Amino acid sequence: MTLTERLSLYEKLARLDKPIGILLLLWPTLWAQWLASNGDPDWLILWIFVMGVVLMRSAGCVVNDYADRDFDPHVARTRDRPIAAGKVSPKEALLLAAGLSLLAFLLILPLNALVLKLSLIALFLAGSYPFTKRFFAIPQAYLGVAFGFGIPMSYAALWGEVPAEAWLLLAANVFWAIAYDTEYAMVDRADDLKIGIKTSAITFGRFDLTAIAFCYAATLALLAWVGALRDFSGWYYAGLAAAGAIAVYHLRLIRERDPRQCFRAFLHNTWFGAAVFGGIVLHFLLRSGSLFP
């Protein structure tokens, strides 16, 4: 196998060819970066966090495929993944995940001690999440904590502490992750039932649509709470309203539980995150007058 072919396999293993996961992890980090900096981000810290998101999401995907190597060959959507197809060995995958994690850790060395301590928790969450599908009825909640841990780390980097506001944002992200990853899990529900892994789509059963609607509502309510605590302007709530409209659109897409439409709704969640971020950015731009000098 040539070096180019090997690198192509690593790219697929790290899902760099499928950026939706990066975006779903990046949006809550960007929310926190703008909120913690009051709309004036430290561009070096922002760059460190963006690169960290890419590296840790990639490492998490590699660990996920390692953990699921005995399950993936039995699922139509995943049987061609590099480890499942026998093109990358489990040992090779672990070395790749370790290398990506090390690069992410090196990135944050210029930051404060609290960020370094929190990064160890983030590493544990990213590495352990794939195994929760064996034990937890709703592993998507664990995913929400893992995907949202850039939130407390962002506040720690900019404030030197993690305030209550950060935990509200993290809770909002947990509910959002349950919503979008349940949509994703609905795609594979039949296969997951056969192989015996646990997902929120299986746990919620016939109440899946109601649960997703509740999680979207809880996400928006918690984000509105953050806005109320900070006395944010109507622009912030306009972003939340846009996100709410997007959530309603997702519920319409998945109402028949068609796997293709469920996957479409999952992919579309990047616009939910973008709408929230847009509201945050507009609030700070218009408050400071920097949009219309």
UniProtKB/Swiss-Prot annotation:
It comes from the Bacteria. One of its GO terms (molecular function) is 4-hydroxybenzoate polyprenyltransferase activity. Keywords: Cell inner membrane, Cell membrane, Magnesium, Membrane, Transferase, Transmembrane, Transmembrane helix, Ubiquinone biosynthesis. It catalyses: all-trans-octaprenyl diphosphate + 4-hydroxybenzoate = 4-hydroxy-3-(all-trans-octaprenyl)benzoate + diphosphate. CDD domains: PT_UbiA_COQ2. Catalyzes the prenylation of para-hydroxybenzoate (PHB) with an all-trans polyprenyl group. Mediates the second step in the final reaction sequence of ubiquinone-8 (UQ-8) biosynthesis, which is the condensation of the polyisoprenoid side chain with PHB, generating the first membrane-bound Q intermediate 3-octaprenyl-4-hydroxybenzoate. It holds the Pfam family UbiA. Pathway: Cofactor biosynthesis; ubiquinone biosynthesis. Its main location: membrane. Belongs to the UbiA prenyltransferase family. This is 4-hydroxybenzoate octaprenyltransferase. The chain crosses the membrane at residues 19-39, 43-63, 95-115, 135-155, 158-178, 209-229, 231-251, 266-286. Its cofactor is Mg(2+). The gene is ubiA. It is a multi-pass membrane protein. It comes from Thiobacillus denitrificans (strain ATCC 25259 / T1).
